[in-house]
């Protein structure tokens, strides 16, 4: 690094004469305020005759004028009034004064004073005028820190790295570059300084309110990554390498590299990776260092898991391996960890910081560090959270507040919910009261109308009543009573049981016939009592079941309608035959007006029974014929008759029980009924007669009622309907799960069910796809489905009330040979697609076999392996080999070199490239092998056989189907398909047999068994190709890196020669002019930062650190730096040997000019050396004379240059020429 603000020494005589004048000129040129403070600082340093320090000052300095040039003067002035003039003069002094002067400035807290200037600028807000002041302060620090002593003092200064890193935020790129150089040197020299830099980066992130600590660094690189000037980019990437590679822990290095990758560093590298080496050699060197170190860390990390044989870069593979290890004993801890990770959000700032914190914790644990931090200072979790972000430290308290607020919110929500429920309940009860009031008046009105109708009916019965001889009336009454006895709708279960358990009637036990007058009187008395009793009881019933909201007319009809459920079978009633046939009952109505309603049931159970209800259109059983004599007239047509019921008649051993219907609408229990014809095989036949008197009907209705939200208008409209309002909108009688799945399946069709049915006849592929046909096979109607639907329809069920699923099953059931049609249709669609999958595989398989057989390049590779292998195995049992199996190719990488840095595969690649370059094209010749790995001949054979089997089954199924003219299109289409499919399947079988034959020949050709699985054979070749390709790319990369290393070393040797010649000139001139400064121009081990930066730029520093890693853990910090410096000095050698990361050693010969120069130097005679020395002395004397001629006032010149730099803010201040 060139010295900046260099100040040239004056002659001794001129210096003595002009010291006072220069001092006075300097002070007079300053502003009044500044002049006063300078005078104060100067007066405090004036020698005093009575002071004992006068002699020391006189010994140290030539005269009292030099007091303004003392370290104390500069430190006091900078602390009192930092300004551009004083810092410019300090820069000049640091370049011209001896190392003892610089050390004295450091001891006077000069570094802290300069850092305070940076802090002052940052604290007061950076202004335009502060840019130059900041640049000068950083330049002075760069000079003071150019030694180990200065760096140690800076590290010991509190908050030094924070104040230094804060100065990165400046518009001047040169200032940032100087800061980056200082930080890089500290990272490489001191472990403590390295940790302070990372902490300062975190603080800088918080000040700028950025999410990541390296955001500013990477973003500044992105801004210039496409520019032609690569110097700044090189300095930044040098700092990145210093930060990443200075850690001794591989896990921390990987973590830091991951942070930079997240911020987009890889993008910057990729943009500048392929530029010509001559344009930016140092930048390309840094890129190589970054990638080489990254690759080395990955290899070192892979060694940890080499026994697992997994890809450590695949998260899914790693998770599967972790789960495999932890699933037995560590299942619960792993599950708890995963559940906790799942609850952490990645969208918020706290969530992101939590993830990074977890990553850091796991890394610390993985390297056996149970505590966070080093042994000297353990960090608690709270402190670590606080260092990660201030907001995270308050997260615990914040979370408690959130939980408390959440509880209050839940309580408020619960109170609002209860309030809404109370309001709804109040509104509902108000509505119920209005409905009850309305129903009460309607009921009273309805009962009055019923009384009038019943009185009219009594009159009709009275006028039509007659008493035939022999007790015909009694026979008629028995006929009337039969339906009532079989309809226990309004009787208790116990009473029903008692009625059904009564013995059958016989002639001896039958009651005497009732006379006409007795029946009339009894009817009148019962009518009056039943009317009043039923009116009051029905009104009470209406109040109790107000939520039912049913029309009264339907309640009466349900009272009269017999229960369709199973009724205990009674023995036929036998009575004495009457002397004359009775009159037939009134004929039933065929859909005319409704019959006159019967009187309501009486509480006591007495009174005459109601007349039988008219048969519905669904076809109920006719009333039983009169006892004795011939039966009554047959049921009217359309009634259905007994045949339909006998088809689903329960077996004799079916369980017997009686259950009444609910009086309100209740929720249904979704079960699947066992068909009656299969009931005899179940355990239900063992139940016998079941008692139901324990059934609490009212409790069940109250618990499972289904409330309706119908309006009053809808209720009034429902009064006019003859159907029961307890029925839901739709009815499903099949398995609920199947009904739901079928509804989902049918929703995919955008056409009516009739079109779906027609598509099965017309083979319409616009409606049916392969997937829908495959699913249809699962939803074909079964016997149970159709039996359930038919049972519903036979029991007066309405077809339109069934769901779409039942309608679909009915449509499908009407299709002839449904299963065969669906299977044929499915195969017709599947067959071409399946062949399209098989044929290309067979063609690729056959082509790849031919490529392997005909590849001369692959044969050459096998030949080279055979020759080298025979040489290595010569004289052993493995020698004299004339052929080897393919798996030997996978073992090439296992044969390591003597230094274990390379292997036999790398050597073979190098031999092939040098001697048989065309053979490297074998990977292109065998490009189809990668796809053949996925092809299994066994799978293809199974698929072809399955297609053939399905085709034969479809052919046989269609042959058994009845052909009709209406289905001519279906049969003709399927006949053509079967004919073409047989031809195609035969061609496919021929191709398969040919491919199988060729593969067997290929397997034998490579020494394998003919029955080896094809996928195993091609996997071996493919693994070799992948391994060869990766190794070849690494070899190419190493070769390019070696070529760049040659150019770099040539440039390094040339620079070393120039530097050596320049140092000789400067040393000679300095010794002649000022013996005090002959030792060094900086502190002690001066030039350390320069040497380190040069070594870092050349890439030698990182190689040396990796080479010494783990071998010198307790050595001094400067040991590696000393080695680096020694290596940089001895870098000029006649030949260079470079070992690539792959282990190949390359001998590098310098360029002709360099070798010629070295050769000339080594063979030069003593006379030539003397002549060269004389020439150098002449050059030095000439330069010193020029310097003396150009001697000027440095402080005034610095001020002038600074003023100019304000106009060009982005010019480097260390490139200013004071001698201009």
Curated annotation (Swiss-Prot):
Residues 6-373 form the GBD/FH3 domain. This is Formin-F. The gene is forF. Keywords: Actin-binding, Coiled coil. Residues 1083-1158 form the DAD domain. One of its GO terms (biological process) is positive phototaxis. It comes from Dictyostelium discoideum (Social amoeba). The keyword Hydrolase does not apply. InterPro entries: ARM-like, ARM-type_fold, FH2_Formin, FH2_Formin_sf, FH3_dom, Formin_Homology, GBD/FH3_dom, GTPase-bd. It comes from the Eukaryota. The lineage of its organism: Eukaryota, Amoebozoa, Evosea, Eumycetozoa, Dictyostelia. Residues 11-20, 711-722, 1161-1192 have a biased composition (Basic and acidic residues).
């Amino acid at each position: 690094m060139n010295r900046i603000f260099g100040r040239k020494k004056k002659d001794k005589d001129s210096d003595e004469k002009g010291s006072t004048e220069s001092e006075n000129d300097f002070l007079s040129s300053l502003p009044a305020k500044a002049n006063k403070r300078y005078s104060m600082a100067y007066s405090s340093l004036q020698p005093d005759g009575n002071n004992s320090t006068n002699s020391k000052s006189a010994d140290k300095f030539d005269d009292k004028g030099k007091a303004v040039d003392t370290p104390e003067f500069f430190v006091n002035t900078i602390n009192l009034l930092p300004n551009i003039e004083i810092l410019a003069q300090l820069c000049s002094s640091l370049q011209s004064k001896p190392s003892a002067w610089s050390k004295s400035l450091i001891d006077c807290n000069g570094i802290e004073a300069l850092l305070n200037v940076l802090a002052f600028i940052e604290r007061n807000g950076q202004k335009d005028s502060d840019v130059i002041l900041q640049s000068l302060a950083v330049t002075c620090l760069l000079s003071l820190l150019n030694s180990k002593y200065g760096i140690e003092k800076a590290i010991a200064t509190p908050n030094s790295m924070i104040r230094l890193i804060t100065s990165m935020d400046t518009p001047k790129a040169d200032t940032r570059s100087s800061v980056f150089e200082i930080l890089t040197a500290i990272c490489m020299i001191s472990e403590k300084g390295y940790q302070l830099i990372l902490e300062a980066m975190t603080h800088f992130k918080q000040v700028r309110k950025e999410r990541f600590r390296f955001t500013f660094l990477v973003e500044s690189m992105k801004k210039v990554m496409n520019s032609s000037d690569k110097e700044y980019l090189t300095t930044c990437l040098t700092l990145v390498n210093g930060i990443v590679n200075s850690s001794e822990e591989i896990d921390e290095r990987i973590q830091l590299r991951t942070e930079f990758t997240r911020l987009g560093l890889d993008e910057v590298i990729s943009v500048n990776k392929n530029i010509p080496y001559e344009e930016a050699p140092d930048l390309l060197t840094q890129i190589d260092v970054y990638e080489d170190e990254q690759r080395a860390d990955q290899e070192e990390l892979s060694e940890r898991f080499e026994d697992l044989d997994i890809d450590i870069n695949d998260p899914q593979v790693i998770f599967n391996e972790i789960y495999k290890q932890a699933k037995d004993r560590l299942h619960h801890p792993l599950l708890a960890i995963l559940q906790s990770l799942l609850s952490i959000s990645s969208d918020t700032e706290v969530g992101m910081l939590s993830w990074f914190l977890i990553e850091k914790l796991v890394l610390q644990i993985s390297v056996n560090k149970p505590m966070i931090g080093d042994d000297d200072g353990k960090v608690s979790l709270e402190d670590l959270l606080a260092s990660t972000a201030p907001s995270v430290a308050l997260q615990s308290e914040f979370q408690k507040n959130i939980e408390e607020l959440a509880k209050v919110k839940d309580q408020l929500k619960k109170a609002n919910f209860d309030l809404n429920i109370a309001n709804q309940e109040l509104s509902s009860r108000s509505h119920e009261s209005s409905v009850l009031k309305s129903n009460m008046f309607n009921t009273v009105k309805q009962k009055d109308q019923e009384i009038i109708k019943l009185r009219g009916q009594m009159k009709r019965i009275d006028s039509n009543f007659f008493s035939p001889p022999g007790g015909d009336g009694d026979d008629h009454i028995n006929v009337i009573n039969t339906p009532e006895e079989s309809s226990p709708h309004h009787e208790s279960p116990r009473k029903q049981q008692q009625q059904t358990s009564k013995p059958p009637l016989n002639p001896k036990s039958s009651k005497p016939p009732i006379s006409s007058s007795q029946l009339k009187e009894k009817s009148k008395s019962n009518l009056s009592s039943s009317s009043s009793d039923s009116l009051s009881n029905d009104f009470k019933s209406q109040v109790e079941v107000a939520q039912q909201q049913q029309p009264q007319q339907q309640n009466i009809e349900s009272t009269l309608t017999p229960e369709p459920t199973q009724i205990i079978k009674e023995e036929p009633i036998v009575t004495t035959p009457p002397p004359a046939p009775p009159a037939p009952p009134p004929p039933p109505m065929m859909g005319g007006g409704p019959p006159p309603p019967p009187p309501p049931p009486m509480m006591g159970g007495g009174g005459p029974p109601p007349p039988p209800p008219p048969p519905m259109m669904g076809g109920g059983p006719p009333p039983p014929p009169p006892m004795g004599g011939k039966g009554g007239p047959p049921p009217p047509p359309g009634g259905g008759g007994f045949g339909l019921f006998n088809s689903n008649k329960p077996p004799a051993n079916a369980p017997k029980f009686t259950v009444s219907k609910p009086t309100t609408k209740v929720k249904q229990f979704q079960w699947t009924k066992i068909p009656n014809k299969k009931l005899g095989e179940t355990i239900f036949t063992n139940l016998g007669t079941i008692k139901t008197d324990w059934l609490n009907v009212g409790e069940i209705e109250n618990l499972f009622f289904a409330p309706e939200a119908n309006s009053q208008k809808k209720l009034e409209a429902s009064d006019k309907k003859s159907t029961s309002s307890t029925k839901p909108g739709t009815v499903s009688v099949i398995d609920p799960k199947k009904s739901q799945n079928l509804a989902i399946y049918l929703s995919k069709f955008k056409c009516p069910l009739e079109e779906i049915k027609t598509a099965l006849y017309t083979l319409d592929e616009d409606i049916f796809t392969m997937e829908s046909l495959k699913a249809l096979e699962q939803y074909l109607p079964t016997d149970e489905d159709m039996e359930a639907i038919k049972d519903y329809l036979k029991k007066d069920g309405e077809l339109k009330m069934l769901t779409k699923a039942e309608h679909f099953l009915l449509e499908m059931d009407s299709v002839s040979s449904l299963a065969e049609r669906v299977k044929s249709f499915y195969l017709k669609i599947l067959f071409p697609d399946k062949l399209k999958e098989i044929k290309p595989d067979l063609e690729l398989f056959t082509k790849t076999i031919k490529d392997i057989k005909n590849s001369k390049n692959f044969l050459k590779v096998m030949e080279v392996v055979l020759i080298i292998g025979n040489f290595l195995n010569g004289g052993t049992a493995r020698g004299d080999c004339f052929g080897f199996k393919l798996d030997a190719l996978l073992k090439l990488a296992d044969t390591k070199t003597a230094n274990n840095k390379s292997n036999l595969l790398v050597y073979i690649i190098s031999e092939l490239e040098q001697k048989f370059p065309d053979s490297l094209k074998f990977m292109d010749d065998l490009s189809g092998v990668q796809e053949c790995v996925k092809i299994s001949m066994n799978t293809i054979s199974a698929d072809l056989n399955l297609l053939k089997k399905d085709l034969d089954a479809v052919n046989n199924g269609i042959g058994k189907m009845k052909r009709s003219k209406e289905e001519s299109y279906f049969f003709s289409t399927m006949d053509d398909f079967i004919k073409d499919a047989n031809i195609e399947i035969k061609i496919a079988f021929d191709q398969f047999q040919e491919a199988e034959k060729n593969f067997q020949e290929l397997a034998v050709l490579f020494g394998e068994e003919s029955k080896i699985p094809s996928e195993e054979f091609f996997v071996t070749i493919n693994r070799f190709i992948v391994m060869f390709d990766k190794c070849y790319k690494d070899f190419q990369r190493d070769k390019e890196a070696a070529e760049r290393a040659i150019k770099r070393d040539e440039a390094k040797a040339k620079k070393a020669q120039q530097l050596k010649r320049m140092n000789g000139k400067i040393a000679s001139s300095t010794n002649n002019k000022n013996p005090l400064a002959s030792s060094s121009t900086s502190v002690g081990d001066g030039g350390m930062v320069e040497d380190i930066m040069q070594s870092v730029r050349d890439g030698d520093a990182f190689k040396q650190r990796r080479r010494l890693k783990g071998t010198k853990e307790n050595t001094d910090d400067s040991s590696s730096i000393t080695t680096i410096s020694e290596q940089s000095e001895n870098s000029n050698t006649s030949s260079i040997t470079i070992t690539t990361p792959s282990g190949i050693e390359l001998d590098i010969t310098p360029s002709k000019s360099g070798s010629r120069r070295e050769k000339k130097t080594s063979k030069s005679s003593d006379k030539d050396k003397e002549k060269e020395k004389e020439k150098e002395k002449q050059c030095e004397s000439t330069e010193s004379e020029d310097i003396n001629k150009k001697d000027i006032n440095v402080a005034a010149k610095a001020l002038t240059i600074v003023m100019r730099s304000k106009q060009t803010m982005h010019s480097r201040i260390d490139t200013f020429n004071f001698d201009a």
